[in-house]
Amino acid sequence: VAENVHDFAWAADHDYLHTTEQVPGGPLLHFFRKDIPELEATWNELPGYMVRSFQFMDRHFGKYPWPQYSFVQGGDGGMEYPMLTLILGNRRLGSLVGLSVHESVHSWYYGVLASNEGRFPWMDEGFTEYASSEVMQELFPRSDDPHAGSIKGYLSLVASGKHEAPSIHADHFLTNRGYGSTAYSFGEMFVHQLGAVVGETALADGLLRYFDVCKFKHPEPVDFERVMEKVSGVELDWYFDQWINTTRTLDYGIRGVLSVDGELRVELERYGDQLMPVDVMLELEDGTTKHYHIPLSLERGARDPGSEPFAFVTLEPWQWTDPTYTFMLPLSMARVGAVVLDPMQRTADVDLDNNRVDLPPGAQGFIRP
């Protein structure tokens, strides 16, 4: 008997081949496919990847609660249900694994957390995309940011002029693109970008706690917000309000860099309407880097020093009403090779051209991007 499920599906075919694979300490995975020779090689490799996927999800996003899960070859695409997914099986290995990961990860968000997909489609598809990208990075490591595509997709939507507030009901978007990009790209970007606010460690801890606290409770955005606030120690109502309920865009830039009395003066400006804290990195002439974090005053705090994989210095908060921000560092301009905003490129900044200033050797005066 299936307990705590809100949907179901079943499949049957006399010609299905059925195999199983046990996740240690977890569910029994079932695999059903047609007896087609061309599918044999990839489907024989799929179980090993799915065991690793479930183990990764259990460690990083919450414990899968049910005793089994089935991957069933269906007619087209992929569709998730509690404890089962129907997937198009005739794919290359990477594609088959990617589809299977995405559809099974839905069990955590569509299945267990079960947010209202009509009201908050990005809380299902977007969170699923974020976790799936993390899983795929574990299975097929890549050198670039596994979430970069979500920022690119969101920025493409903004540039198209079809961007609508993510708070709109799924049925009421004016275009299919607006709905799709908001549910998938924006949702993943929203979670990923939150790491630039609270730090990667707090984000990871918060996502795990979110699942444990809200499972089977149909959470809304405010529930995720409260969990992240408790984990990070900063206020996040401004982040959730502006990114979910408006179409404002983010654009912070460097106005200029200059030397004042032997010290480095950096002037920043908020060109867009969207608010965010700001990360700054200095590339020094000796090849080393220095990182600085400028909290937003609305946070009423700042992320913990150990919340990032790199050391950083926290500067005075940027008052949210001020369009500009200036800070001084006890560094000779001659020691600095470049000043960079958002060096990890975790934010959906619409204009990266003003995020970097390179300082030529011996540079003096006011240097602009």
Residue ranges of model-derived segments:
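Amphipathic alpha-helical substructures
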Residues: G180-G272, K290
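Hydrophobic helix-coil surface modules that form long, contiguous segments used
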Residues: V1-V101, Y130-S133
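Active-site-adjacent bridging/hinge elements
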Residues: P27, G77-M79, H102-S107, S156-D171
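Beta-strand-rich binding/interaction modules
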Residues: D237, L250-Y252, G256-P343
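Short acidic/polar inter-strand loop motif in beta-rich domains
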Residues: P343-D353
